[in-house]
Amino acid sequence: MENIYLTLALSPLIGSLIVGLAGNRLGRTLSHTITILGVAVSTVLALYVFNHHVLEGGDVFNENLYTWMQIGSLNISVGFLVDNLTSVMLVIVSFVSLMVHIYTIGYMVDDDGYTKFFSYISLFTFAMFMLVMSNNFMQLFFGWEAVGLVSYLLIGFWHGKESAVEANLKAFLVNRVGDFGFLLGIALLLAF
């Protein structure tokens, strides 16, 4: 199952990186096909995970994939926690993201930033998966920050419009307030 969870989480990231780095050379059709394929793979796997955990009553998966950093007795690792709630959220996130990707084909048809936008929304999907599947507070925080960063990029995508710039600044400031509370909570949990 570990490979299924990894593939589910990494498929949108791979699509985002390919399109982000080579989208203009690939062209619009291939760019949106790559990102949609990555999210579609995640959606199919999310349905499989949902079936395994919720419908068949599979065991909770809580494993560290690797230790990222060790500071004294504090281990900062990357891992996944997949239970019934996570399985439901994976289906919701992947399905909604797939629908957004498909809708974006028509919505962005005349926009010069077509491939960049697809790269961003695919990256957003990966960030949401990392947030939903995290098995520790540090990874949860990094997932939260990644969602905030990509939200910032998407909200300010049309940076030539004054309203987009204002909304972007507002989202950035609101996220920083949330970050402070989040970090304070993590610090209190680690202290006690």
List each language-model region with its residue ranges.
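...captures the hydrophobic TM-helix bundle architecture rather than a specific catalytic motif
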Residues: 1-192
